[in-house]
Amino acid sequence: DVCSSDREAQQERVQEIPLSELHPFEGHPFRVVDDEEMMKTAESVRDFGVLTPAIVRPDPDGGYEIVSGHRRHRASELAGKETMPAIVRDLDDDAAIILMVDANLQRESILPSERAFAYKMKLDAIKHQGQRTDLTSSQVGMKLQAMDIVGQEAGESRNQVHRYIRLTELIPELLDMVDTGQIKFNPAVELSYLASEEQKDFLSAMDYAQAAPSLSQAQRIKKLAQEGEC
């Protein structure tokens, strides 16, 4: 009806919001760093402004929580701006997480750790939305498991999504080595099945040997750990 259309239009209206009132999304898994790409973005914002409005939601503690637009927010700060354009939406936690993840997965360069925690957050949100994992996918008109939905919308197989999420079980030191390419993806997945203390022991051994494990070595270490021999 006319009233609901007016409300939707009002909700989607672009507003100029002070940067000081915009807060990062809690648990945001994507890094915002002042690298060369950020400097280019800041220069663009300085010259042309923010061309795509951020999406934010009201923060119960005051101001707004950024759902999509963390890099644009930082670039605006570096460009010396005081405000940035944003669309305010009333989103519950699950809807906000899904939107935040989907928006950031469009980036060209994403670290394995970022993708891992993003998939995990989205999976948990989809499950929580209805407390069921057989949610209906409108795209294909059939019931799909939550893991399948995450994969389908990211262009990944269910198995690959699961493997990425396994990386969230790695201790921070090993996960950093995956991000920097010191440990390859497949061996890292195998190492994620080790307990934290076993991972720490492995890290010490790896430092001593000055070498990263191959996939077969990681599989062997995982097998020994499961058999209680590691």
Kindly give the residue locations of the regions a language model identified.
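Residues at the start of alpha-helices and the adjacent loop-to-helix junctions
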Residues: 67-68, 143, 180, 217
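EF-Ts-like protein-protein interaction surfaces
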Residues: 166-172, 182-230
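Short, charged/polar connector segments at secondary-structure boundaries
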Residues: 1, 5-89, 95-109
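Amphipathic, charge-rich alpha-helical segments that serve as recognition/docking helices
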Residues: 30, 74-169, 176-179, 186, ...
